[in-house]
Amino acid sequence: MAGEKKTEVVKIMNKKILAAALTATMVGSMFSTVAGAEEAKNIPELTTEPMEIVFWHHSTEDPSKGIVERAVERFEADYPNIKVTMTAQQNDTYKQQLVVAMSSGKAPNMYIHWGGGPMVEYYKSGFVNDITDMFNTYDHPDYIDAAVAQASYDGKVLSIPYGGLSGCDIFYNKTIFEEVGVEVPETIDELEDVCDKLLEAGYVPFTLANGSKWTGSMYYMYLVARHSGNDEFNAAYAQEDGGSFTSEAFIWAGEKIQDWVKKGYFNEGYNSLTTDNGEDRALLYNNTCAMMLQGSWNVRNFVNDSQEWTDANLGVFRFPEDAEAREKGVPQNVEIGTAIGNGFSFNCWKEDGSVDQEKLDACYVLATQYFNDDTYNEEQMTLAQAIPSIKGYEDKIEDPRMQYVADVFFNASNVQLWYDQYLPASVTEVHKNCMTELFGLDKTPEEIGQEQDVAMQAALAE
């Protein structure tokens, strides 16, 4: 049986879907009316002299890799004097290498990030151009307000939204649920009942690849949000008026996670598996696990691995509510995610420290006109199952799972940005290590709360 499972996983993980190979000309033009009719654009006039843009991103596999490359190809075709030198690395490696590059003073001219605290620190360290005036002067897509807000800091626009909306929901195997006779849970108590029945039937409830650390944080974030809305996190972030990562909601969330660990709700070896390699999805494919709490970008990964398996088995539901907190008036529609997915920031400077405006102009045009044109957005939606952070696109979603994610996102009272992106970079590392310790039962919720408090206080004092 184990051999059959391994063979099936290899088949699924290596299977390439036809859609990933489609070129821009093969994708329908059903979204052409969103951006409006073609007309003269108000964009910077770019240099005709030879120029190189060093561009880093994290799209290492199709379909996203091809979408990025084709956007750059369209730009280079229109501006043949400008060469875009691209480097792509997987998420966790990318983050590490970007910090290394900045530490050595060799950061790329254009790079993606996840917004939040790290973006602010990149800016304060001198690796982000302030593009407020350009954003207010030149054409750009009609981004949703939340995306512009997330791309900004202290009244300054510091990045161009890229990648689209990303929610966080529970993906599940509908076939297993039907076999076991369980329904989609609406409350955390019901979720625990489902998990117990799955265990009795021989299935591990959740697949988790917490070697990436931020994956475990999703459970922590949602449990805190369901128990207290945004209030306790906001207070802990400010470290004022008694705010602390040891407050009631954080302790409750940590204890709940450790209780789930002890009950066997997660797969074996979860702290050593990585999500970049799809090791969490593999445990869904071989029927070891029944559910996975993850970002909505995984719809693309599921389809890319196997359209057939996805259509036959994959369902999605929002993180269940805390019934007791709801009775106390705590909002239950705070969702975890991001309004921009990623942002493009620019690092264009001359040797004397002044802004290299010609290169900055070129980066701005590439980011706003080629990574956000009709072709790019069509491919994002049809090939990558992404939801552009641009007004009007939410009505064009065809994939039912992504439509569900979008509905949850747009009906949220508030969208909490991932802790590992919202927190200052120094606190983020502490937080992620705390997730390893929490899920590993190495430290108590109180102990990791104290560690995060110390890190937050140090960051605020800088």
Region roles according to the model:
Residues 39-45, 114-168, 183, 192, ...:
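Hinge/lid segment of periplasmic solute-binding proteins
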Residues 44-46, 130-143, 183, 227-252, ...:
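Short, solvent-exposed loop/beta-turn-alpha elements that line the ligand-binding surface or hinge
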Residues 48-61, 82-87, 109-110, 158-159, ...:
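Short, well-ordered beta-strand elements
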Residues 74-152, 175-186, 282-283, 290-291, ...:
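Extracytoplasmic "Venus flytrap"/periplasmic binding protein-like
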Residues 77, 83, 180, 263, ...:
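Extracytoplasmic/periplasmic substrate-recognition and gating elements
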Residues 152, 381-389, 403-460:
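C-terminal capping/gating helix-and-loop segments adjacent to ligand/active sites or protein-protein/ligand interfaces
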Residues 154-162, 168, 192-242:
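Extracytoplasmic/periplasmic solute-binding protein
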Residues 197, 239-272:
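Glycine-centered hinge/linker elements that transmit conformational signals in sensory
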